[in-house]
Amino acid sequence: MRLPMLGEETRAELGGKAAPLAVLRRAGFPVPAGFSVPLSEFERHLAACRAPCASGTEIRDRLVAQGADATLRADLADALDALPGGRDTPVAVRSSATTEDSPETAGAGLHETILGVRGPDAMAEAVMRCWVSWWSPRRLDAPPRTGEEDADGMAVLVQVLVDADAAGVLFTGERRVLEAVHGLGESLVGGAVTPDAWELEDTGVRDHRPGSQDLRAVRRGDRVLREPLPAALRDRAPLGEDRVLEIDALGRRVEEHLGGPVDLEWAVDAAGVHLLQARPLTAVLPEPSDEGSDGDGAGTVLHGVGASGGTATGPVRVLRSVAELSRVRPGDVLLARGTDPAWTPLFPLIAAVVTETGGMLSHAAIVAREVGIPAVLAVPEAMERLEVGAEVRVDGERGTVAVIEPRSPARGPGRAPGDG
């Protein structure tokens, strides 16, 4: 079969990530050229791996052993040849599961994205990685959805990679916020840096909050690396105001075309603005508060970006790596430099999340909004200024973390309740 170019497919074959982009590309929006590996290809390869009573893990392992067949490999080569620049053009390969980027859930980081893929062999491997991520630990641990499992699956979206000078996200709706970083957007989504942010209104920019970025993600050959941000860029915003307003206007057109508020991932290179992802907003952004932050009688009050609304109180639990996840107890306030998809299973357990870096599109922010817990991100030196075990109040509307009660000496230095 010929793999359909982006814009030709039906929604049932596309999955949640690719479907809105196909709609936008057909309508003339600046969506990078690409193609999809439709759901039917996933199902065709899966059919040879199924066996009576086989578990998801067993099916996954059989799929890996089988690999992409000769027919799919040939189709991938033909589809790459049809792209601008031909088969050696660097592309982004993204999962497009039927269960992600819906109005109910974004599925942040649940499945694979591989950037800088070049050539048919690397493409076949990347498609397999996306397919295998259908059995990610988070999904296998989740309860099955009655009546839907057989209809679900994994398509794959392939697009020409934009070697971005700047990238970010725009949230449309009643509150419009644009966030941007230098380089590829991977550093923003991964929460590795704190982006510049612009609050927008009908008359233009209402407020600009400078970010904190000491590294950027760039493509080097077929790899995406994080490199130190050049000194000349460290005091320079990723975007000028004219470009901010251009992206805002584009976002309003997308919102009107798709029929509702979206969060819109975009990238800018020498050719202009490119739309990389458009998904329905799964939760309302907290409104910025102009109220004073006196902590309601509390002691130390730290300030950051309110990324998920609500208020919660609990003991501070500091985690410095994913290897420490087992230390978390229900009701803890998670404190980390940043989080990534491997941390996702913690979020239903914790009362709130606080990070030193990140923005509205970072993993911690998206998952916190979906789970419904407060999140305050980009809190400078939070891991040094908050004691392990101290009782704190996290206010996701105000963007504050207030110490209510310092750590009890009985808990010992560096220990919180439940550390044993």
Question: What is the meaning of each model-derived region?
Answer:
Residues M1-L157, A164-A166, R234-D242, E255, ...:
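N-terminal beta-alpha lobe that positions the nucleotide/phosphoryl donor
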Residues G119, T172-R175, L200-G204, R220-R223, ...:
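Short acidic-glycine loop/turn motifs at beta-strand connectors
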Residues L188, P280-L285, T311-D332, R337-G420:
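Acidic, glycine-rich flexible loop/linker segments
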Residues E256-T282:
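Conserved metal-phosphate-binding beta-hairpin within the catalytic cores
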